[in-house]
Amino acid sequence: MDSEYYSGDQSDDGGATPVQDERDSGSDGEDDVNEQHSGSDTGSVERHSENETSDREDGLPKGHHVTDSENDEPLNLNASDSESEELHRQKDSDSESEERAEPPASDSENEDVNQHGSDSESEETRKLPGSDSENEELLNGHASDSENEDVGKHPASDSEIEELQKSPASDSETEDALKPQISDSESEEPPRHQASDSENEEPPKPRMSDSESEELPKPQVSDSESEEPPRHQASDSENEELPKPRISDSESEDPPRHQASDSENEELPKPRISDSESEDPPRNQASDSENEELPKPRVSDSESEGPQKGPASDSETEDASRHKQKPESDDDSDRENKGEDTEMQNDSFHSDSHMDRKKFHSSDSEEEEHKKQKMDSDEDEKEGEEEKVAKRKAAVLSDSEDEEKASAKKSRVVSDADDSDSDAVSDKSGKREKTIASDSEEEAGKELSDKKNEEKDLFGSDSESGNEEENLIADIFGESGDEEEEEFTGFNQEDLEEEKGETQVKEAEDSDSDDNIKRGKHMDFLSDFEMMLQRKKSMSGKRRRNRDGGTFISDADDVVSAMIVKMNEAAEEDRQLNNQKKPALKKLTLLPAVVMHLKKQDLKETFIDSGVMSAIKEWLSPLPDRSLPALKIREELLKILQELPSVSQETLKHSGIGRAVMYLYKHPKESRSNKDMAGKLINEWSRPIFGLTSNYKGMTREEREQRDLEQMPQRRRMNSTGGQTPRRDLEKVLTGEEKALRPGDPGFCARARVPMPSNKDYVVRPKWNVEMESSRFQATSKKGISRLDKQMRKFTDIRKKSRSAHAVKISIEGNKMPL
């Protein structure tokens, strides 16, 4: 990098045209590269120098640069470098020494002197040193770049000095030529930019000014320092006076001014400067450089392009590769076009700078073409190659002008289209939201109505819901019409009332039947699950899988179906025999075989699916003469029913087993044990209907206690009747408030009295009043005992036992006698 900076690629910071001129005297190829790089960077820097000279004319540079000198003590190093370089330059050129009379003054102020001292050289050295020294404090990267640029510049100035020594006339001549142009640019700040453009910058410079302010605000700290880096660096440098003075410079040097000054129409940049100044000096920069930095995506585009363009735009900080790229004027112009396109896009976002920048770009490219033509005329005398490069750049710039205008127009059109599109989209979205909201409301209403209809179809109307449980109970267990029969008291009324609301849902969930369910519009649609259920029902009586799983047991199905047929036949024969007034013994004779099969665990589900419940109902039902079946039959079948797995409500409903069991439960002549079994069966079968659970494992302790409290019967307190002797309060008697009855007193009883029965139910455990300190202490002490202590205690205990086991020696003297 240093070699490249010293080789002349660093000419960007060292003052574009002087480096070019020196290189003109030195090397033409380097001059081309330096033209483009130094033109781009020093163009911006020269803008600063020219702007700052014009600022000096305006009186701005002093305060602004004084702030630089105040802020830039490190800059003083650079300033000293630029001053030493300027001293060399003073030795090299009297015209430079004349302006160095100013530079020292501006050197103390900071690097305005350097700006004017070496015009484009010391201007960039000064600005870059000034800005770079500022950047050195804040932006080491850019400061290092700017320092390297300063070094490059100063070294460039040194190399320029060497080249000046080689061709002092060329330096002074170029500076003199620059001075006239600078004077022109001083008289005309836009020409100043043009002068800087004509001096250094071919098209790259305006864009370099923009792209540098965007990309290398820091490298261009010379340019973008006054524009943004003053902000970045000046704000970073703790003194935003610098940025603001430099912003005052940047006000005269605004990127718009780069372009504005580059643009022949200085009024546009000035209005824009006025806009940017009225907005804020930062906003001047913000308009171009800052805005393009702030939209750093775009600035990054311009910067990323800039580095690539960068050779054009970032000739200062960009590597020699970029400097090498700069000589490639076509690539540079294209990249600069991209940079300016991105800038124009950024400006299109900033409508203030948009129109001006379009004009600036057009005027820039035009003026740059004129400047390049001027440079070509000057350089034609010096270099034919520079002339070719300038023409090439002019042509590229003319192309880039068209591209920039097109891009600016596109950006405007795009921004307008974006606004209109966004408005239209917002309107459309609003309409869509409204339509969607209305549609969703209608759909919600339809869904609610459909849900209500479905609920009515499933559960019936609300008026029916209250009676649904009763209807289901009546279907399963029959009507309770016989008053003389015993009432079922299996449930507490609270349980039934609390769980009535859940009954319908539980019913629907537990029931397998599709009865009373009107599918409505879903009539044609059957889910896979429903189809599977239908297949299962159709296959239910035919094939069964063994629980072990595996093989089909068709023989078991045959046995089960044959047994059920026999049971139904036996029940029918018994009814016929009963009608004939004959003993009905068919069921009794078949009972052992039925019990044997029904007790087989692997056949229970098969029996249930095959319809054994209806056969059992036939067996438990009373005979035609209203007599109960044999007691043995009732006992065995009730036991088997208890052992059967859970039975679905549909099976209970269709088989009628519930009615038969309820009949037995209520029958006055049924045995107590059978009634208990029947009550348990009814309780178990009806629990799912009322949503009650019989699983107490899932209940917490609090829930169980609450359940016990709720189910606890409310006993009436036993009050003394009027005919009995009023019971005396023993506590009052014992405390002496009332005298104990003596013999002969009314109410005295000369016998021991049985204590009153307590009507208290101890459900809640009484509070434990005994302190637990001792137990806690023991627990803690036990925890504190180590294994060693335990072993020692065991050892001592064993020794004591072993000693006591031996015969005790009695001491005649009475020694070791326990007292």
Swiss-Prot record:
Residues 523-819 are annotated as: Interaction with SUPT6H and ALYREF. Sequence repeats lie at residues 235-260, 261-286, 287-296. A motif (Integrase domain-binding motif (IBM)) lies at residues 469-495. Residues 377-386, 480-500 have a biased composition (Acidic residues). It is found in: Nucleus. It holds the Pfam family Med26. Residues 44-68, 85-102, 189-210, 228-275, 319-328, 349-376, 425-436, 443-459, 699-710 have a biased composition (Basic and acidic residues). The modification N-acetylmethionine is found at residue 1. Residues 235-296 are annotated as: 3 X approximate tandem repeats. Residues 1-520, 696-728 are annotated as: Disordered. GO terms for biological process: chromatin remodeling; in utero embryonic development; mRNA processing; poly(A)+ mRNA export from nucleus; regulation of mRNA export from nucleus; regulation of mRNA processing; RNA splicing; transcription elongation-coupled chromatin remodeling. The keyword Repeat applies. The keyword Iron-sulfur does not apply. Belongs to the IWS1 family. Interacts with SUPT6H; binds preferentially to the POLR2A-bound SUPT6H. Interacts with ALYREF/THOC4, SETD2 and PRMT5. Interacts with HDGFRP2. Interacts (via IBM motif) with PSIP1 (via IBD domain); phosphorylation increases its affinity for PSIP1. Transcription factor which plays a key role in defining the composition of the RNA polymerase II (RNAPII) elongation complex and in modulating the production of mature mRNA transcripts. Acts as an assembly factor to recruit various factors to the RNAPII elongation complex and is recruited to the complex via binding to the transcription elongation factor SUPT6H bound to the C-terminal domain (CTD) of the RNAPII subunit RPB1 (POLR2A). This is Protein IWS1 homolog. It comes from Homo sapiens (Human).
